[in-house]
A protein has these predicted regions:
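Detector for methionine-enriched segments
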Residues: 1, 14, 44, 108, ...
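Short acidic active-site motifs
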Residues: 39-43, 141-144
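Extended, charged helical scaffold/adaptor regions
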Residues: 7, 43-44
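Hydrophobic, helix-rich cores of sensory/ligand-binding and other regulatory modules
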Residues: 50-63, 71-236
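N-terminal basic/disordered segments at the start of proteins
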Residues: 1-36
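Hydrophobic alpha-helical transmembrane segments of multi-pass membrane proteins
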Residues: 29-39, 45, 51-61
Length: 236
């Protein structure tokens, strides 16, 4: 039986995950799309019966974090880490030949950028890093990118927010989305599937019990059959 996973994500991420998910057996994906990550809590209320929930990024996960304690099924999210940053920077340098110090990049944790640059022993001028927080409107991040572009301090923008990317494209500012490594997405899908299977196996663990019936009390086979049916058990 396949594992049904509800995925809360953007339209762009849906296209990417569909192309990757075919490498994983016995999963069924159902998408709930947002224009902005802040819409994730509303989408949570629309989810149909499924085996697990997957958020297409850290932002939609953070917006729904307070609701997850009430969710009876496993959940997971695509995490932004050093692998994501390094994959994106490598793609940028290879395809666009833009200098690191001419980039504005928005990330969940600025330390990830520092860690990647330290790992490759980069000692030059660092990129302009914009910290993403759910307490700050994404419009502010967009404005900072635009200001750096208008002042000619940058030649390119890397963004983790799909709505910001769409705005930058409309303004014809050179930009790209953050790239989640294919391997990371596959691992997250496999992990989500495993969590669901584990939850199911825990729910159906066999339990041995003893029902003691007083000698002066007679229970017919019909009553015993009703008890075993209600508890999904057998008796001897």
């Amino acid at each position: 039986m396949s594992t049904k996973i509800a995925i809360i994500c953007s339209k762009a991420f849906m296209k990417r995950i569909i192309s990757i998910a075919q490498n994983i057996t016995d999963i069924q994906l159902e998408f709930y799309l947002y224009s902005h990550p802040s819409e994730a809590p509303t989408l949570m209320k629309q989810i149909k019966p499924c085996d697990a929930i997957l958020f297409g990024g850290t932002l939609p996960y953070l917006h729904t974090q307070s609701l997850l304690s009430e969710v009876p099924i496993p959940w997971n999210y695509i995490k932004q880490d050093e692998t994501t940053i390094s994959t994106t920077l490598l793609s940028l340098v290879a395809k666009h030949a833009v200098a690191i110090d001419r980039i504005s990049i928005d990330v969940m944790n600025p330390a990830f950028v520092d860690n990647v640059l330290a790992e490759i022993e980069f000692h030059g001028q660092k990129p302009y890093v914009q910290h993403i927080s759910i307490t700050e409107p994404t419009e502010n991040i967009l404005k900072r990118h635009i200001a750096l572009w208008n002042s000619k301090n940058i030649d390119f923008v890397i963004t983790s927010i799909h709505s910001v990317f769409d705005e930058l494209q409309a303004l014809q500012i050179p930009s790209m989305r953050m790239l989640d490594a294919t391997k990371s997405i596959i691992q997250c899908l496999e992990e989500t599937k495993s969590k669901s299977l584990l939850t199911k196996s825990e729910a159906f663990k066999a339990v041995v019990g003893l029902l003691e019936i007083p000698k002066d009390c007679s229970i017919g086979s019909t009553v015993l059959s009703q008890i075993t049916k209600a508890t999904f058990s057998t008796f001897k």
